[in-house]
């Protein structure tokens, strides 16, 4: 009885952190160690998730920023017929779309963080920021891989890690579907 921690779960991405199963069996917590008021656990957990969604937005922005920088660098270095692939208009449009997506996510995250810092309600804004940023990170890493061609699929390139790490962002701190529910609930309230 009590607290038990299982073995580390191997994960596809985010290998800098570890995932463990934690079990509480007959575990008694003294009242002075309780977080929040009795019966308010769900509300407390939701506030933690709202804060976490801003952090996920920042993480997604960082992943996408690194992927975009890699794509821009590669487009300037990689040559076809003696000229960089950056000369192709289609590739330029991909880079432009990636940059716009990245800026939109950054600004949505800043708005949610600003509301939090001002002590205002920010649940819907955090959900919007997290939804956009997590899906944006997937789009941007995918386009960066496309720009790199076959080299982008290599495990020797950092894009492999960015793509793996971007994928979990649409799941934790509430999946994209949950974010849509939160946003819609706030719109319809």
Regions found by a protein language model. Name each.
Residues 1-73, 80-83, 175-189:
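FAD-binding core of flavoproteins
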Residues 14, 120, 127-189:
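Alpha-helix capping/hinge segments and adjacent helical runs
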